[in-house]
């Protein structure tokens, strides 16, 4: 019996990983994220998780800064990424 082998070359910084994913959960995530492929759905979900973590961190900083003082770094962080009013 002959076994076939395939050489898989990934781009730098990319790891090929085989995982079991719940099909229903993947379909629901794809619909929510507006993605059409499994790869795009997983990448979008990972990015969404990182954005959620950053938002939680920012909210914690805002809560700690609720003393009424203006922290310029905090204000800049609030408006920096993707906010149309601050596209500097």
Curated annotation (Swiss-Prot):
Keyword entries, A-Z: Toxin-antitoxin system
Cited InterPro entries: VapB_antitoxin (IPR019239)
Swiss-Prot/TrEMBL GO biological process terms: positive regulation of growth
Pfam families, sorted: VapB_antitoxin
Primary role: Antitoxin component of a type II toxin-antitoxin (TA) system. Upon expression in M.smegmatis neutralizes the effect of cognate toxin VapC21.
The name this protein goes by in its record: Antitoxin VapB21
Organism of provenance: Mycobacterium tuberculosis (strain ATCC 25618 / H37Rv)
Taxonomy of the source species: Bacteria, Bacillati, Actinomycetota, Actinomycetes, Mycobacteriales
Gene: vapB21
């Amino acid at each position: 019996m002959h076994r076939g082998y395939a050489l898989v070359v990934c781009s730098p910084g990319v790891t090929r990983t085989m995982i079991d994913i719940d099909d229903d959960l993947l379909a629901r995530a794809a619909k929510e994220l507006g993605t059409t492929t499994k790869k795009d759905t997983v990448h979008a979900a990972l990015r969404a998780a990182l954005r959620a973590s950053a938002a939680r961190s920012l909210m914690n900083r805002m809560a700690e800064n609720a003393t009424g003082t203006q922290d310029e770094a905090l204000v800049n962080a609030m408006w920096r990424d993707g906010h149309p009013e601050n596209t500097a």
